[in-house]
Amino acid sequence: MYASARDWARFGQLLLQDGVWHGEHLLPEGWVRYMATLTPQSVRRDFGAHLWLKVPPPFDSPVKPGPSLPSDAFHVVGHEGQFVSVMPSRALVVVRLGLSRGSHVWDHDAFLARLLEAFPPVKPD
């Protein structure tokens, strides 16, 4: 599916808001939580219902262990390194539309970790 970065960001925002858009439930309540829950059949223990719970190879960090991302992070992964990454605990949606071919040409784990370092959580007043 082809869409603009803005459209993908809206999709990520819809997931971040548990399927609610402008006060209207577009997805059943709890559906996103279900999508972001580990599927028992996931051999590598990293896949939910159409969402990756960890950055999949070859876009994960070649350094082991890789950078630490929030435990509630999940990812929609597209063709050759396109990502919509959602981190509910940080109220953050990140879209990447780059084209990456080959092994470990894009380290999405490290990119997200650097982004989180650059924008620390806001402390409530």
Protein language model regions, located:
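Short, conserved, surface-exposed binding loops centered on an aromatic residue
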Residues: M1-A3, E24, Q41-V43
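Active-site-proximal alpha-helical segments within enzyme catalytic domains
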Residues: M1-V20, Q82-G98
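Stable alpha-helical elements in mature extracytoplasmic
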Residues: S4-W8, W31, F111
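Non-transmembrane alpha-helical segments in soluble domains
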Residues: A9-L16, V32, A36, W52, ...
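A general structural signal marking secondary-structure boundaries and capping sites
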Residues: D18-G19, T39, F119
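Structural helix-adjacent loops and short alpha-helical linkers that scaffold large soluble proteins
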Residues: G19-P28, H104-V105
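Active-site Gly/Thr loop motif
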Residues: T37-V93
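Structured C-terminal helix/loop/strand segments within mature extracytoplasmic catalytic/sensor domains
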Residues: A73-D125
